[in-house]
């Protein structure tokens, strides 16, 4: 555990050295979220609030989509911004090979480096989600229908989505360590837009999902479980020989 903590601290410090890139990526996440919230406000929330009796279930759905997007963007853009850059830098400089020569377990290296990417994303995703909850309520809901909140929205946004990205981070770093970082990057870069687009489309266009229900939380937790199973299956690849030969 001590080795993992040291790896996390060191890698987080290294990851945030390129402040310009970090500002650009995090700024992008914030701009996308603001644009999405404004779009939902104009096209969906405002028309519903202008009705004589606004449908609170629909308002919870729209709030759930915005909070889901905030959590996913915060965690996803963080993984996209830091994961690939970190792996490329470490492999090109031979940092991983240097660590392999020490008594530190390879599994500790993998978990520590994955957590060094995940923790900043968890903080960013949590903050964006909390800001979205408060901002959407006080800009749109409170003046007309009061504070809108559903516990399942919170569980999905603060637990299920981070769990997905924790497992995805382990998978991405496992593939990056034992193979080519570009392959890991493809997974990370493709997952965010595909996942968020499919979920939003299904929430808006169908009645299969409801962002404010326990089933939505269960579906996202199930996705995290699927990714976790993939990680367990692929763990056999994590050997010093394979990591060394992947350069």
Spans of model-derived segments:
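Aromatic- and glycine-rich beta-strand/loop motifs that create alpha-glucan
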Residues: 1-29, 244-247
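Junction motif at the cytosolic side of a transmembrane helix
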Residues: 15-16, 178, 223-247
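Hydrophobic alpha-helical transmembrane segments of multi-pass membrane transport/permease proteins
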Residues: 18-47, 65-79, 189-203, 221-232
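Transmembrane helix boundary and interhelical loop/hinge segments in multi-pass membrane proteins
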Residues: 79-100
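Secretory targeting signals
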Residues: 119-167
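Extracellular/periplasmic helix-loop-helix junctions in multi-pass membrane proteins
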Residues: 181-187, 201-222
């Amino acid at each position: 555990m001590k080795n993992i903590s040291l790896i996390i601290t060191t890698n987080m410090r290294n990851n945030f050295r390129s402040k310009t890139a970090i500002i650009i990526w995090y700024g992008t996440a914030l701009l996308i979220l603001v644009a999405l919230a404004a779009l939902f406000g104009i096209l969906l929330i405002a028309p519903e609030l202008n009705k004589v009796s606004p449908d609170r279930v629909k308002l919870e759905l729209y709030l759930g989509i915005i909070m889901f997007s905030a959590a996913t963007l915060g965690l996803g853009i963080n993984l996209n911004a830091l994961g690939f850059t970190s792996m490329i830098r470490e492999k090109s400089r031979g940092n991983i090979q240097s660590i392999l020569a020490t008594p530190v377990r390879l599994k500790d290296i993998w978990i520590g480096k994955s957590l060094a990417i995940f923790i900043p994303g968890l903080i960013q995703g949590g903050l964006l989600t909390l800001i979205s909850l408060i901002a959407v309520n006080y800009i749109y809901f409170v003046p007309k229908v009061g504070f809108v909140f559903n516990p399942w929205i919170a569980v999905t946004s603060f637990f299920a989505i981070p769990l997905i990205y924790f497992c995805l981070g382990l998978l991405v770093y496992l593939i990056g360590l034992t193979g080519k970082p570009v392959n890991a990057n493809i997974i990370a870069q493709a997952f965010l837009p595909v996942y968020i687009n499919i979920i939003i489309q299904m929430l808006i266009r169908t009645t299969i999902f409801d962002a404010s229900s326990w089933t939505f939380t269960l579906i996202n937790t199930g996705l995290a479980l699927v990714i976790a199973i993939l990680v367990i299956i692929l763990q056999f690849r994590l050997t010093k020989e394979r990591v060394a030969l992947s350069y």
